[in-house]
Design a protein with these regions (language model features):
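A short, conserved, highly charged catalytic patch centered on acidic carboxylates
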Residues: 2-3, 7, 11, 15-138
C-alpha cells in the first residue's frame, strides 16, 4: 500500500534529506560544471548586496527560528531581485503542488513549491522552505 506523506513533516532537516535520498554534499567544482563555468565576475555592488543579505539573515537567525515569510522577505526575494529573475523574460508563480513518488519505499511525498520562476529550460524553485537551518551565498 502506498503511503502519502507531507514533505514538510517527512523531511525535517538537511541530515534527514541526505539520509533519505542518499545524498552527499560536495564542494567539487567539477560536480556541475554547467553551473560554474563561464560565469561573469560579480561586481563590487553585487558582492556588497550579497553580504548585506547574508548579514541580515544571520542577525535575524541569531534570535531563533525564522518563519517562512520572514525568510522570503530577508533572503529569497532579495536574491531573486538581485539575479534579475523578476524581470523580463522571467515569470514568477507560487504554490504549485508537487508529488515525489519513491518506488523503493512505496511512498508519495506531497508538498508545494514556494516559488517557481520559469523561462524556457531555466527553472528556479524554492521547495518547502519552512524551517531553514543555514544560509550560504557563494
Amino acid at each position: 500500500m502506498v503511503l502519502t506523506k507531507p514533505i514538510s513533516k517527512t523531511i525535517t532537516s538537511l541530515l534527514n534529506l541526505r539520509e533519505r535520498f542518499n545524498l552527499t554534499p560536495t564542494s567539487n567544482d567539477q560536480f556541475s560544471p554547467e553551473f560554474t563555468q563561464d560565469l561573469p565576475e560579480l561586481t563590487d555592488s553585487e558582492i556588497a548586496a550579497l553580504d548585506q543579505i547574508r548579514n541580515r539573515f544571520l542577525r535575524h537567525r541569531e534570535r531563533g527560528s525564522l518563519a517562512e515569510g520572514t525568510i522570503n522577505h530577508l533572503v529569497i526575494s532579495p536574491l531573486l531581485a538581485l539575479a534579475g529573475l523578476y524581470d523580463e523574460p522571467f515569470f514568477v508563480t507560487t504554490e504549485p503542488e508537487v508529488e515525489l513518488f519513491l518506488e523503493d519505499r512505496d511512498e508519495i511525498l506531497r508538498g508545494r513549491i514556494d516559488t517557481l520562476i520559469i523561462q524556457q529550460q531555466l527553472w528556479v524553485l524554492v521547495v518547502e522552505s519552512k524551517s531553514t537551518i543555514a544560509f550560504s551565498v557563494a
